[in-house]
Amino acid sequence: QANRYRFLQRTQTASAPGKDFQTWDLPRLFAEIEKQLVMALASAETLKKIPVSDFDALLVKGNVPDSYRPTMYDFLAHEALAFYNSGEQAAARSQAAFDLSADSPVFSDTAQFLAWKPDSKDDASPQLKAIRLYQQLLGFHAKDDDRSAWLDVDLLRMNFGKNFSFGEEKDARYKAALKRFAEAHADHPISSRALYHQATVVRGEGELVAARKIALQGKNRFPNSVGGRQCHNLIAEIEAPTVNISTERVWNDPLPVIDVRYRNLTKVYFRVIQYDWKQRLTNRGSRRPDYMDNKERRVLINQKPVVEWSADLPATADYHEARQEIPARAGLKPGSYFLLSSHNEDFSEQNNRVHVCDFWVSDLALVIRNRNGQG
């Protein structure tokens, strides 16, 4: 992946490739990868009898037990799926190109998905090859006592449908499939993963309260599972307090307001720090507030404020961003200032983000009007 740009710049040639794969173009490289995967999976019946644990010394284990990939067939089949689902090996589309419709059985129950025989002559389609692999894996694990591998594949083919299908009903069918899966397999940790994906879709639709409720169900069901932790993180993102401020660059009578955009907060704290504009102008390392790094922010936070105060904010029960206008502080002497905001009273860096903007207090202001781009 790091050297992808090198391969993209190469022109496809008709001559046979040399032994050094670093000189190949992308189509040739992908063709060779697929060739090796197909050759490996040709021995499927043998691979199905080889426990993946036999190769522990060679494989980098993930965060799930071997029951999710119990055999070398599972390992190689999922490697092939990762290849087909990457989208990198897409070639020029033929007239008979396979298109995955959202109203196809890709989101139907498992029995309908297994019975599905896509009507397509596009044998080169990566999506078509992936569908067949999902079906083969589901058939292989259909009678397993441990349902982990079977359930994992069933959930993955739904995610595959979400990523590659088209149609207005895609999200609705995907959500329905995830809900059906989570309810039918509520006694297995994988159901928390399904709830996480369902909550993610609902969140993307702007229904944050509903998304949090679904994610909380997944977290409480299996808190230490992969899906449980994903749900925990999603809830944390939805509940995360945020605040951003902006104001006029020049404060004079009548005083402007501080525009506060926030969520999951009921109070915001302000500090005003005075600075020497001449010194800052001659210091090449000085940057505008939007581009300050943590070190520069820390220096500001540690300075004694000219004034500090707080303002109450209406609660955001729906977790969406709200906006309030807070009156600017009166009584400041003419000069240059930084305005800092925080949702922690002590302006600490832990679980907090300090926002900074700059302004002047002056009786004068310069208004520039552009006329047809001439200034």
Segments the model singles out, each with a brief description of its role:
Residues 1-375:
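N-terminal, cleavable Sec-dependent signal peptides of secreted/periplasmic/extracellular proteins
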